[in-house]
Amino acid sequence: MVHDFDPFALRISGDFGIRWYGLSYMMGFICAYILITWLAKRQRAGLSVQMVGDFITYAAIGTLVGGRLGYVLFYGPDLFLKFKSEFPYWGVLAVNEGGMASHGGIIGIVIACLLYARKYSVNSLYLLDLVAVTGPIGVFFGRIANFINGELVGRPCDPTYPLAVKFPQDIVSWPGQEAAKLTELVPVVEKVGVGREQWLELVDKFRFDMAAREQLYATLNKVIESIQDGNTAAKEAIAPLLTPRYPSQLFAAFGEGLLIFMFLFFLWRKPRKPGFIAACFVLIYAVVRVVDEHFRMPDAHIGFQALGLTRGQWLSLAMFVVGLILMVVWTRAASLKIPGWQRGHSIKLNRK
């Protein structure tokens, strides 16, 4: 299939509107609120139902700030020094340039939990357990939004693969990586009102003429938006030119999202020591992310690193080591167990 999803759930004007990406975060926080409220009622482990709203606010801020700073630190440090005359002025705040990083979001949530625990005298490890079991739901919605946006695309796959997807967004990278293929877009750009001679002239000049370069990229984006708006002629014309790819975003939605959530939720049906669920999340997420990255293209400006691994895989390996340490420390601690959610277990904290 040729990807033709519009990133806007509701486009109000131009680039202003309600995006699926924003809705995915909202859905993640709403689901987290509902589930944490339910757990707080059953477990009675120090977080009252009345406190859940404030806690979710802390977690949301930690997720957003940590996710963005994580991307800038791990994948785009040049954004710290990038300033523009237009809003939002600073590259760090321009979330449309690179987006968010899940590893950074995890760090942000940890800091948010520690701050909340200190202010409201709640067990910090219990808070980490709560976000560990609910966080994957947000990851699920986020990865679905990644797919709708046509970002974080998968690696090339066999054209006969039944789930193969072709992303028109690939053509935006052609000027810098596969310029020779630009001339093949003649029948495509003609479907959006750009003539053959005009397009070939832009292709000839874009390397040294800034105006031609801007117009060329504007035409490429026009093609993508036209396909998203239902231009079947452009969609059919571009299909043979695109590389079939794994729907890695959907793989991640299932693996990093649903699979981890179901496992941790099932695991917490019985009493566990504070931090046990969080440590399990760190370990499992690291493993699943390493596997998922085998189907996902690395960031173009970073590429593959040592041993043929991606930046995300190396970060996940480091995360796995941290998870092992946390598991050993937290499970050996002489702490009270937190009740599980399954009926029949005591709502009081039990000593092991």
Curated annotation (Swiss-Prot):
One GO location term (cellular component): plasma membrane
EC numbers: 2.5.1.145
Tree of life domain: Bacteria
Binding site for a 1,2-diacyl-sn-glycero-3-phospho-(1'-sn-glycerol): 143
Pfam families in alphabetical order: LGT (PF01790)
PROSITE patterns for this protein: LGT
Cell location: Cell inner membrane
Major location (coarse): membrane
Protein name per the record: Phosphatidylglycerol--prolipoprotein diacylglyceryl transferase
Native species: Bdellovibrio bacteriovorus (strain ATCC 15356 / DSM 50701 / NCIMB 9529 / HD100)
Gene field: lgt
